[in-house]
């Protein structure tokens, strides 16, 4: 797995590689649907939002498949491309939605994904 998350929440990965993204800090006494989305620099959604429902747990894991990360293109003239991601936790019983802050971020901060071009085509 080549997905790396640094201390400020920036994700680095190779295009087309898989990885797991673990989100913690949920209230284990509540039911949630948690969403993960990636956008380009123009705020266009890349692929579909991923969603996971969880009950009685303070963590949820998103599986980033090779097909999903392959949507993150790196232009040939660039060594990498930057995308942005967001995570939202929605309480199922109360219809409350909260965008989650990653690491020490706050309003206006962007959660970055640095995507490097494929090294090997694979399957």
Predicted regions and their residues:
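Contiguous segments within soluble domain cores/interaction surfaces
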Residues: 1-123
